[in-house]
Amino acid sequence: MTRLLRICGSVLLLSAIAAAPHALRAQSSTAPEVLLRLDDIGMNHSVNLAVEKVAATGMPFSVSLLFVCPWYQEAVEILKKYPNVTVGVHLALNSEWRNYRWGPVLGKGGVPSLVDSVGYFLPSVDAFLASKYDLGEVERELSAQVERALRSGLTITYVDAHMGMAEATPQLREVAERVAKKYGLGISTYFGESYFTLWGVPVASKKSALLQHLANARRDSVNLIEVHVAERTPEMEVIFDMNAPSQNTPDAGVVAHRKGELETMLSPELAEMVRSGKIRLVTYQQLVARVGVAGMRRPQ
């Protein structure tokens, strides 16, 4: 029954987009603007498959891609098929999963202050902040991640910070801003967005929390919704977050959280809100075109 509801929801959403191919023209211009940002694509196959399911609905949204991860190449292939998806670089300085680690694009020798003894990024925000990281190496590594993204053949529109790490101090934020400016990219949260994340919401409450938030969405700003999706696969069943122990609860775990957020994105209730014009979906491609990178403002 649940699967049937998800399928019906996807059909509703596809019908809505077919009836209004340019940015869902059937939606009211006075409806609150909502920007769905799906983070961590490229992390692994499970996340890539989940993002593709959302992309296949035709729903316009933005994705933040981890170009430091081995699975980013599959993510690139997937995203090239979906013009409804706007792509950003998920600037990474951490590798938080136990037994599944990654390191910098520039390698251990290129940025030695950013890695542990075997060349992986540090597992948590606290560990990174306590380390003797070099800001020059941070800038070189973040630039290398953007350059890898630009070479991928995807249109890259914006950057944001994986785990908030690249914006965790005023000095790190300045580095991230310089990198974005150098490549003419937008920065997520620099367009006056209000921010809501499903990340810490209990699994059973994710859908209701999102629907309630959207029902009360602001009309004086873009409503940014941060989402993390994944399919339930063996690799996701055993994954363990070394940065956020709250995600590793015995009754749920990371996979339950991310599968729950995928089901929320595919729910018939969300599809109906889009179809009926109660919300108007936008992406960072539209915000950059509207405001320009010169019009961005650092969030307060």
Regions found by a protein language model. Name each.
Residues 187-190, 245-300:
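C-terminal domain-boundary segment and adjacent tail
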Residues 40, 87, 159, 225, ...:
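Conserved, mostly hydrophobic/aromatic
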Residues 21-28:
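Boundary at the C-terminal end of the N-terminal hydrophobic targeting segment
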Residues 132-218:
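Catalytic domains of cell-wall/extracellular-matrix polysaccharide-remodeling enzymes
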Residues 102-129, 240-253:
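Active-site gating loops and adjacent loop-to-helix segments of metal-dependent hydrolytic enzymes
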Residues 51-57, 74-86, 103-116, 150-151, ...:
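Acidic (Asp/Glu)-rich catalytic clusters
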Residues 29-98:
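Active-site beta->alpha N-cap acidic-glycine motif
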Residues 8-20:
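Bacterial N-terminal signal peptides
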